[in-house]
């Protein structure tokens, strides 16, 4: 069973998205956060269940999609690092994702 490790930037991303949604609908924001954490928790048993992002062919990253968000992660042994959470309608900045990965052990 893999261990989930949320990075601080990924948690900040999720907080910012939830805060924005909560301006109009606090219940929807809470539900989104709950769904994302539940979806991420499934990775402990099925770490390769996330898809390979089409923009990142050949890279080691995977994603899970819990609309309106995409959650990017990578597996390293028995750990899964949650690196980046973004709105699904935005374009992925690959350099931004790679920069976040520099503080995570290989």
Residue ranges and their predicted role:
Residues 44:
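Short proline/glycine- and basic residue-enriched helix-capping loop/turn segments at helix->loop/beta transitions
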Residues 30-31, 51-54, 94:
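Short, hydrophobic secondary-structure boundary micro-motifs
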Residues 1-33:
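Arg/Lys-rich, positively charged N-terminal/basic patches that mediate binding to nucleic acids
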Residues 11, 18, 37-40, 83-86:
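Conserved protein kinase catalytic domain
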């Amino acid at each position: 069973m893999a261990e989930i490790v949320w990075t601080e930037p990924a948690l900040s991303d999720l907080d910012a998205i939830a805060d924005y949604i909560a301006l109009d609908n606090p219940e929807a924001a809470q539900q989104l956060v709950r769904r994302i954490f539940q979806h991420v928790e499934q990775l402990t048993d099925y770490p390769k269940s996330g898809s390979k992002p089409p923009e990142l062919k050949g890279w080691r990253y995977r994603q899970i999609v819990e609309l309106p968000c995409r959650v990017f992660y990578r597996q390293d042994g028995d750990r899964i690092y949650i690196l980046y959470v973004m709105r699904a309608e935005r374009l992925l900045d690959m350099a931004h994702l790679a920069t976040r990965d520099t503080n995570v052990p290989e």
